[in-house]
Amino acid sequence: MEIKQHALAGTLESSDVQIMIAPANNGISIDLISDVKKQFGKQIEATVRQVLAAYAIENADVQVIDKGALDLVIKARAIAVVERAIEAKDLNWEVL
């Protein structure tokens, strides 16, 4: 699938994550900003990549600003931002 527009999901509140996505032509680029990047950075990035793979997204610029979100919150925000960016009309229940 293709990213059609810039999109954003989440907040900068404690225990949340804000994910922004934009169209790209050079594969998937993830910029992670987090106070716990050293401990959990690989897991956060893996969760985002898992959602992108489920939607068959091959090109995207993604910025993730983590404020201590749990993995399930990160996944939910990633799904929301992709759904907005691809202008989905119906939810892809297989991804959930």
Curated annotation (Swiss-Prot):
UniProt entry keywords in alphabetical sequence: Cytoplasm, Phosphoprotein
O-(phosphoribosyl dephospho-coenzyme A)serine: modified positions: 14
GO cellular component, one term: cytoplasm
Protein localization: Cytoplasm
Family: Belongs to the CitD family.
Described function: Covalent carrier of the coenzyme of citrate lyase.
Protein name: Citrate lyase acyl carrier protein
Gene: citD
